[in-house]
Amino acid sequence: MKVAVLGAAGGIGQALALLLKNRLPAGSELSLYDIAPVTPGVAVDLSHIPTDVKVKGFCGEDPSPALVGADVVLISAGVARKPGMDRSDLFNINPGIVKNLVEKCAASCPKALIGIITNPVNTTVAIAAEVLKKAGVYDKRRLFGVTTLDVIRAETFVADAKGLNVDKVRVNVIGGHSGVTILPLLSQIEGASFSAEEVAAMTKRIQNAGTEVVEAKAGGGSATLSMGQAACRFGLSLIKGLQGEANVIECAYVEGDGKHATFFAQPILLGKNGVETVLDYGKLSAFEQEAMEGMLATLKADIQLGVEFVK
Protein backbone atom coordinates (compact mmCIF):
# COMPACT_ATOMS: atom_id res chain seq x y z
CA MET A 1 0.00 0.00 0.00
CA LYS A 2 1.15 3.50 -0.80
CA VAL A 3 -0.16 6.39 1.30
CA ALA A 4 0.55 10.00 0.37
CA VAL A 5 0.25 12.83 2.91
CA LEU A 6 -0.07 16.29 1.33
CA GLY A 7 0.79 19.02 3.79
CA ALA A 8 3.26 16.74 5.54
CA ALA A 9 5.44 19.50 7.02
CA GLY A 10 2.58 21.07 8.97
CA GLY A 11 1.45 20.31 12.49
CA ILE A 12 -1.19 17.78 11.45
CA GLY A 13 0.93 16.37 8.64
CA GLN A 14 3.97 15.63 10.81
CA ALA A 15 1.87 14.06 13.57
CA LEU A 16 0.01 11.98 10.98
CA ALA A 17 3.22 10.91 9.26
CA LEU A 18 4.77 9.81 12.56
CA LEU A 19 1.71 7.71 13.42
CA LEU A 20 1.51 6.17 9.93
CA LYS A 21 5.23 5.29 9.97
CA ASN A 22 4.56 3.31 13.14
CA ARG A 23 1.20 1.79 12.20
CA LEU A 24 0.99 1.15 8.46
CA PRO A 25 1.12 -2.49 7.36
CA ALA A 26 4.62 -3.89 6.83
CA GLY A 27 5.88 -3.24 3.33
CA SER A 28 3.88 -0.04 2.88
CA GLU A 29 5.24 3.13 1.32
CA LEU A 30 4.67 6.52 2.94
CA SER A 31 5.02 9.45 0.57
CA LEU A 32 5.26 12.92 2.12
CA TYR A 33 4.70 16.17 0.23
CA ASP A 34 4.66 19.80 1.25
CA ILE A 35 5.59 23.03 -0.47
CA ALA A 36 8.05 23.66 2.40
CA PRO A 37 11.70 22.71 1.75
CA VAL A 38 11.91 20.93 5.11
CA THR A 39 9.77 18.03 3.85
CA PRO A 40 12.54 15.71 2.60
CA GLY A 41 14.15 16.21 6.02
CA VAL A 42 10.93 15.16 7.76
CA ALA A 43 11.09 11.97 5.69
CA VAL A 44 14.74 11.37 6.63
CA ASP A 45 13.89 11.93 10.30
CA LEU A 46 11.03 9.41 10.13
CA SER A 47 13.15 6.93 8.16
CA HIS A 48 15.28 6.37 11.28
CA ILE A 49 12.30 4.79 13.07
CA PRO A 50 12.66 0.98 12.86
CA THR A 51 9.47 -0.11 11.08
CA ASP A 52 9.02 -1.80 7.71
CA VAL A 53 7.52 1.31 6.10
CA LYS A 54 9.55 3.13 3.44
CA VAL A 55 9.34 6.94 3.64
CA LYS A 56 10.07 9.42 0.86
CA GLY A 57 9.78 13.21 1.04
CA PHE A 58 9.01 15.67 -1.74
CA CYS A 59 8.84 19.47 -1.74
CA GLY A 60 8.28 22.31 -4.16
CA GLU A 61 5.35 23.46 -6.28
CA ASP A 62 4.43 20.10 -7.85
CA PRO A 63 3.19 17.19 -5.72
CA SER A 64 2.92 14.82 -8.71
CA PRO A 65 6.05 12.75 -7.93
CA ALA A 66 4.65 12.01 -4.46
CA LEU A 67 1.29 10.91 -5.86
CA VAL A 68 2.14 8.40 -8.58
CA GLY A 69 0.81 4.98 -7.58
CA ALA A 70 -0.84 6.18 -4.36
CA ASP A 71 -3.68 4.03 -3.01
CA VAL A 72 -4.69 6.57 -0.36
CA VAL A 73 -4.12 10.34 -0.31
CA LEU A 74 -4.66 12.34 2.88
CA ILE A 75 -4.73 16.12 2.39
CA SER A 76 -3.98 18.31 5.40
CA ALA A 77 -2.32 21.22 3.57
CA GLY A 78 -3.50 24.73 4.34
CA VAL A 79 -3.53 27.36 7.06
CA ALA A 80 -4.72 26.62 10.59
CA ARG A 81 -7.20 28.52 12.70
CA LYS A 82 -6.10 31.24 15.09
CA PRO A 83 -8.01 32.64 18.08
CA GLY A 84 -11.17 34.46 17.04
CA MET A 85 -11.45 32.54 13.76
CA ASP A 86 -13.90 29.80 12.92
CA ARG A 87 -13.36 27.18 10.23
CA SER A 88 -15.20 29.26 7.62
CA ASP A 89 -12.63 32.06 8.03
CA LEU A 90 -10.13 29.76 6.34
CA PHE A 91 -12.13 30.02 3.11
CA ASN A 92 -9.92 32.77 1.69
CA ILE A 93 -6.83 30.55 1.50
CA ASN A 94 -7.50 26.84 1.84
CA PRO A 95 -9.94 26.22 -1.05
CA GLY A 96 -7.33 27.24 -3.61
CA ILE A 97 -4.79 24.91 -2.03
CA VAL A 98 -7.21 21.96 -2.04
CA LYS A 99 -8.27 22.67 -5.63
CA ASN A 100 -4.67 22.63 -6.87
CA LEU A 101 -3.75 19.47 -4.98
CA VAL A 102 -6.84 17.54 -6.07
CA GLU A 103 -6.18 18.52 -9.70
CA LYS A 104 -2.79 16.82 -9.31
CA CYS A 105 -4.44 13.76 -7.73
CA ALA A 106 -6.82 13.53 -10.68
CA ALA A 107 -3.85 13.45 -13.05
CA SER A 108 -1.43 11.26 -11.07
CA CYS A 109 -3.58 8.84 -9.02
CA PRO A 110 -7.19 9.03 -10.30
CA LYS A 111 -8.23 5.81 -8.55
CA ALA A 112 -6.84 6.72 -5.13
CA LEU A 113 -9.04 7.11 -2.08
CA ILE A 114 -8.82 10.80 -1.12
CA GLY A 115 -9.38 11.97 2.45
CA ILE A 116 -9.79 15.73 2.91
CA ILE A 117 -8.65 17.06 6.30
CA THR A 118 -8.16 20.70 5.27
CA ASN A 119 -10.83 23.00 6.71
CA PRO A 120 -13.50 24.11 6.09
CA VAL A 121 -14.24 20.43 5.30
CA ASN A 122 -17.94 21.10 4.59
CA THR A 123 -16.74 23.19 1.64
CA THR A 124 -13.36 21.72 0.64
CA VAL A 125 -14.87 18.27 -0.04
CA ALA A 126 -17.38 19.85 -2.43
CA ILE A 127 -14.47 21.62 -4.14
CA ALA A 128 -12.59 18.33 -4.49
CA ALA A 129 -15.66 16.65 -6.00
CA GLU A 130 -16.11 19.40 -8.59
CA VAL A 131 -12.41 19.24 -9.54
CA LEU A 132 -12.59 15.46 -9.99
CA LYS A 133 -15.79 15.79 -12.05
CA LYS A 134 -14.10 18.31 -14.35
CA ALA A 135 -11.25 15.85 -14.83
CA GLY A 136 -13.71 13.05 -15.60
CA VAL A 137 -12.50 10.82 -12.75
CA TYR A 138 -15.01 11.49 -9.96
CA ASP A 139 -16.18 8.41 -8.05
CA LYS A 140 -18.22 9.34 -5.00
CA ARG A 141 -17.09 6.13 -3.28
CA ARG A 142 -13.49 7.38 -3.27
CA LEU A 143 -13.79 10.86 -1.76
CA PHE A 144 -14.10 11.50 1.98
CA GLY A 145 -14.20 14.40 4.36
CA VAL A 146 -12.32 13.24 7.45
CA THR A 147 -14.62 13.95 10.41
CA THR A 148 -13.03 11.35 12.68
CA LEU A 149 -11.81 14.06 15.06
CA ASP A 150 -15.43 14.77 16.02
CA VAL A 151 -15.88 11.05 16.70
CA ILE A 152 -12.79 10.60 18.87
CA ARG A 153 -13.62 13.76 20.81
CA ALA A 154 -17.16 12.52 21.42
CA GLU A 155 -15.88 9.12 22.52
CA THR A 156 -13.30 10.68 24.85
CA PHE A 157 -15.63 13.25 26.41
CA VAL A 158 -18.45 10.72 26.95
CA ALA A 159 -16.09 8.16 28.51
CA ASP A 160 -14.68 10.82 30.84
CA ALA A 161 -18.10 12.15 31.83
CA LYS A 162 -19.64 8.73 32.46
CA GLY A 163 -16.65 6.83 33.83
CA LEU A 164 -16.65 4.36 30.94
CA ASN A 165 -13.82 2.44 29.29
CA VAL A 166 -13.09 4.66 26.28
CA ASP A 167 -12.15 1.62 24.17
CA LYS A 168 -15.73 0.40 24.49
CA VAL A 169 -17.46 3.72 23.69
CA ARG A 170 -18.73 4.18 20.14
CA VAL A 171 -20.37 7.43 19.08
CA ASN A 172 -21.69 8.18 15.61
CA VAL A 173 -21.34 11.83 14.66
CA ILE A 174 -23.40 12.96 11.68
CA GLY A 175 -23.89 16.11 9.61
CA GLY A 176 -20.77 18.10 8.82
CA HIS A 177 -17.51 19.24 10.40
CA SER A 178 -18.09 22.70 11.84
CA GLY A 179 -20.15 24.26 14.60
CA VAL A 180 -23.84 23.40 14.52
CA THR A 181 -23.35 20.91 11.66
CA ILE A 182 -21.54 18.54 14.06
CA LEU A 183 -24.18 16.29 15.62
CA PRO A 184 -23.11 13.50 18.00
CA LEU A 185 -25.82 10.88 18.42
CA LEU A 186 -25.62 10.63 22.20
CA SER A 187 -29.02 8.93 22.44
CA GLN A 188 -27.59 5.82 20.77
CA ILE A 189 -24.62 5.20 23.07
CA GLU A 190 -24.83 1.82 24.76
CA GLY A 191 -24.42 1.83 28.53
CA ALA A 192 -24.81 5.58 29.01
CA SER A 193 -27.79 7.81 29.62
CA PHE A 194 -27.90 11.60 29.69
CA SER A 195 -30.29 14.20 31.07
CA ALA A 196 -31.56 16.83 28.64
CA GLU A 197 -29.12 19.33 30.18
CA GLU A 198 -26.21 16.91 29.80
CA VAL A 199 -27.08 16.26 26.14
CA ALA A 200 -27.16 19.98 25.36
CA ALA A 201 -23.89 20.65 27.20
CA MET A 202 -22.06 17.62 25.77
CA THR A 203 -23.22 18.38 22.22
CA LYS A 204 -22.01 21.96 22.55
CA ARG A 205 -18.64 20.88 23.94
CA ILE A 206 -18.08 18.46 21.04
CA GLN A 207 -19.10 21.13 18.52
CA ASN A 208 -16.76 23.71 20.08
CA ALA A 209 -13.85 21.42 20.95
CA GLY A 210 -11.68 22.80 18.17
CA THR A 211 -12.08 26.31 19.54
CA GLU A 212 -11.18 24.97 23.00
CA VAL A 213 -7.80 23.87 21.61
CA VAL A 214 -7.21 27.04 19.56
CA GLU A 215 -7.80 29.20 22.64
CA ALA A 216 -5.73 26.97 24.93
CA LYS A 217 -2.78 27.19 22.53
CA ALA A 218 -3.04 31.01 22.75
CA GLY A 219 -2.27 31.71 19.13
CA GLY A 220 0.25 28.88 18.86
CA GLY A 221 -1.84 26.63 16.64
CA SER A 222 -4.95 24.51 16.39
CA ALA A 223 -5.73 20.84 17.05
CA THR A 224 -2.81 19.14 15.34
CA LEU A 225 -1.98 16.12 17.51
CA SER A 226 -5.54 14.88 18.04
CA MET A 227 -6.28 15.55 14.36
CA GLY A 228 -3.20 13.56 13.41
CA GLN A 229 -4.49 10.66 15.50
CA ALA A 230 -7.97 10.96 13.99
CA ALA A 231 -6.61 11.06 10.44
CA CYS A 232 -4.38 8.06 11.15
CA ARG A 233 -7.35 6.06 12.44
CA PHE A 234 -9.36 6.94 9.34
CA GLY A 235 -6.47 6.30 6.94
CA LEU A 236 -5.80 2.89 8.47
CA SER A 237 -9.50 2.06 8.15
CA LEU A 238 -9.38 2.97 4.45
CA ILE A 239 -6.45 0.58 4.04
CA LYS A 240 -8.21 -2.21 5.94
CA GLY A 241 -11.13 -1.81 3.57
CA LEU A 242 -8.87 -1.89 0.51
CA GLN A 243 -7.26 -5.08 1.83
CA GLY A 244 -10.66 -6.76 2.12
CA GLU A 245 -11.07 -6.75 5.89
CA ALA A 246 -14.71 -7.20 6.88
CA ASN A 247 -16.90 -4.81 8.90
CA VAL A 248 -14.67 -1.73 8.72
CA ILE A 249 -17.02 1.08 9.73
CA GLU A 250 -16.22 4.76 10.26
CA CYS A 251 -18.15 8.01 10.11
CA ALA A 252 -17.13 10.29 7.24
CA TYR A 253 -18.45 13.21 5.21
CA VAL A 254 -19.39 11.67 1.87
CA GLU A 255 -21.81 11.97 -1.02
CA GLY A 256 -24.67 9.66 -0.11
CA ASP A 257 -28.27 9.54 -1.26
CA GLY A 258 -28.72 13.30 -0.96
CA LYS A 259 -31.64 12.96 1.44
CA HIS A 260 -30.36 15.78 3.64
CA ALA A 261 -27.62 17.43 1.57
CA THR A 262 -25.29 16.45 -1.28
CA PHE A 263 -22.58 15.64 1.28
CA PHE A 264 -23.38 14.39 4.76
CA ALA A 265 -21.32 12.79 7.51
CA GLN A 266 -22.67 9.42 8.62
CA PRO A 267 -21.46 5.86 9.22
CA ILE A 268 -20.06 4.08 6.17
CA LEU A 269 -18.90 0.53 5.49
CA LEU A 270 -15.47 0.62 3.86
CA GLY A 271 -14.19 -1.87 1.31
CA LYS A 272 -12.13 -2.37 -1.84
CA ASN A 273 -13.85 0.51 -3.64
CA GLY A 274 -13.81 2.92 -0.71
CA VAL A 275 -17.41 3.40 0.39
CA GLU A 276 -19.15 0.04 -0.03
CA THR A 277 -22.35 1.08 1.74
CA VAL A 278 -23.64 4.27 3.33
CA LEU A 279 -25.19 2.99 6.55
CA ASP A 280 -28.37 4.11 8.25
CA TYR A 281 -27.56 6.24 11.28
CA GLY A 282 -30.59 4.96 13.18
CA LYS A 283 -33.38 6.62 15.12
CA LEU A 284 -32.80 10.14 16.38
CA SER A 285 -34.04 11.61 19.64
CA ALA A 286 -36.27 14.69 19.48
CA PHE A 287 -33.25 16.87 20.37
CA GLU A 288 -31.15 15.28 17.61
CA GLN A 289 -33.92 15.54 15.02
CA GLU A 290 -34.36 19.23 15.75
CA ALA A 291 -30.59 19.82 15.65
CA MET A 292 -30.29 17.96 12.35
CA GLU A 293 -33.08 19.94 10.72
CA GLY A 294 -31.58 23.14 12.11
CA MET A 295 -28.14 22.52 10.59
CA LEU A 296 -29.18 21.78 7.02
CA ALA A 297 -29.36 25.35 5.73
CA THR A 298 -25.82 25.99 7.01
CA LEU A 299 -24.51 22.72 5.57
CA LYS A 300 -26.09 23.27 2.16
CA ALA A 301 -24.72 26.82 2.00
CA ASP A 302 -21.22 25.53 2.85
CA ILE A 303 -21.47 22.95 0.05
CA GLN A 304 -22.74 25.52 -2.45
CA LEU A 305 -19.73 27.73 -1.69
CA GLY A 306 -17.49 24.88 -2.79
CA VAL A 307 -19.43 24.17 -5.97
CA GLU A 308 -19.34 27.84 -6.97
CA PHE A 309 -15.62 28.14 -6.16
CA VAL A 310 -14.75 25.69 -8.95
CA LYS A 311 -17.20 26.98 -11.56
Swiss-Prot record:
**EC annotation?**
1.1.1.37
Reaction catalysed by this chain? (S)-malate + NAD(+) = oxaloacetate + NADH + H(+)
The UniProt entry annotates the active site at 177 (proton acceptor)
Q: Which residues bind substrate?
A: 81, 87, 119, 153
| Any single Pfam family the record assigns to this protein | Ldh_1_N
Per UniProt, subunit arrangement is: Homodimer.
- What PANTHER family does UniProt report for this protein, alphabetically? MALATE AND LACTATE DEHYDROGENASE, MALATE DEHYDROGENASE, MITOCHONDRIAL
State the Gene Ontology terms under molecular function. L-malate dehydrogenase (NAD+) activity
Does the keyword field hold NAD?
yes
Q: Which protein family is named in the record?
A: Belongs to the LDH/MDH superfamily. MDH type 1 family.
Q: What does this protein do?
A: Catalyzes the reversible oxidation of malate to oxaloacetate.
Which Gene Ontology BP annotations are present? malate metabolic process; tricarboxylic acid cycle
Q: What name does this protein carry?
A: Malate dehydrogenase
Residues binding NAD(+), per UniProt: 7-13, 34, 94, 117-119, 227
Q: Record the organism.
A: Aeromonas salmonicida (strain A449)
Keyword NAD in the entry? The reply is yes
Its GO CC terms? cytoplasm
Q: Entry's SUPFAM superfamilies?
A: LDH C-terminal domain-like, NAD(P)-binding Rossmann-fold domains
InterPro entries assigned: L-lactate/malate_DH, Lactate/malate_DH_C, Lactate/malate_DH_N, Lactate_DH/Glyco_Ohase_4_C, Malate_DH_AS, Malate_DH_type1, Malate_DH_type1_bac, NAD(P)-bd_dom_sf
